[in-house]
Amino acid sequence: MTTTDDRPTETANVRLGLAPTDPRPANETGPLADRQKTNPLFNDQKMKLGLFGTNCSFGLIMSHAASSYEVTWEHTKAIAQRADQMGFEALIPVARWKGFGGSTNFNGNCFETYTWAAGLAEATEHIAIAATSHLPTMHPIVSAKQATTIDHISGGRFALNLVMGWVTPEMEMFGGSQREHDRRYAFGQEWIDYAFKLWSETGSFDVDGEFFYGRDVEAYPKPVQGPRPALVNAGNSASGIEFSARNVDVNFASLDTLENVKTYTSSLKEKAKSEYSRDIQTMTYGLIVCRDTEAEAKAAFQNVVDEGDWGAAGNVIKIAGSGASQSFDHVVKEYQERFIAGWGGYPIVGTPEQVTEELVKLNEAGMDGMIMGLIDYKEELEIFNDDILPLMKQAGIRH
């Protein structure tokens, strides 16, 4: 990628006059639709729903617990189409270039997320489809163009989940060295500023920043969604919160208690409003285990833990605990089993009534959505459809 280290010398910096001589037509230079109308992430459901991790091996569980889940195109497509039929708002993939070792090599078998999103955009009708992108691995010009293309394929349903690349062994595969935590967010801010211009500028422009350099930059067409595609970020550190409040539409948070959820969501939403005059949604993730009885649900959850890949979990905890990510600090110290059963997220275990009650509590604490993992996505979506969705409607958090 062309960064500021690759700036051409003054003698080589000659403009070749390739900019269009006539104004570009409206279908190239402007958004085609209001994203409030095309992207379900902006609908009026009180508690939005989504699936997390249906593109990579073992989903959200580091475990050999029995499941029909597999990483094949037909399987992931079937899951996406069923969630779409059920009225879920979003599919958010995990971006992974290297597994976490252990006996499962957790998440090591993984579909690349932009092409995954493009395929599912064509295969679905209503649900928002995200790509999760490690910003250090993608130039903004390439990523913005891919995002625009998927937005056109989907009719304005695309979302881009921006991640800074906290897994050091993974980032080192690309030949560079890992930046310090706050420097990753400084890079991310310049990256997204560049992308914003690519999605909005109707003519060519120059970029001359700390991390990126470009001359006569242009990008056509623009996304379907105006003013830009939906953006997601999962940063929960001070730098991550600042980045989210300033730039994105959904903050994706890993939290441990309802009290912390309430404090976190109110603080972030107030920061976005008071400092940047923006509205932001907060959503969480975690493993949902629902069975007919509480005992059955707890037994299924415990089986995930008992069959856990503690080697992979230990590797994740080691990387997160090294300071590579500050978003998991509280989880690393106190809730190691949550990595085995839910990737460090908020677990909900119980009967349909208990699951619904917990979702209501999360919503009352300020969460606008739950992006869930399931032990067996394809099979357990039917439990959610038949037993939980009706109760959520009765509770007033879905309609």
Model region roles, listed by residue range:
Residues 47-51, 91-93, 129-133, 158-162, ...:
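Hydrophobic faces of well-ordered beta-strands that scaffold small-molecule active sites
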Residues 90-114, 255-258, 372-385:
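Glycine-rich, proline-tolerant flexible connector loops at the mouths of alpha/beta enzymes
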Residues 59-74, 132-141, 177, 225-238, ...:
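Active-site mouth loops of central-metabolism enzymes
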Residues 10-55, 81-85, 174, 181-227, ...:
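An alpha-helical appendage that flanks or caps ligand/catalytic pockets
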Residues 141-143, 148-166:
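Hydrophobic or amphipathic alpha-helical targeting/insertion segments
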Residues 104-130, 187-191, 274, 384-399:
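Alpha-helix-loop-beta-strand connector modules within alpha/beta enzyme cores
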Residues 71-96, 243-251, 361-367:
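Catalytic domains of carbohydrate-active enzymes, especially glycoside hydrolases
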Residues 49, 83, 87, 120, ...:
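Conserved, mostly hydrophobic/aromatic
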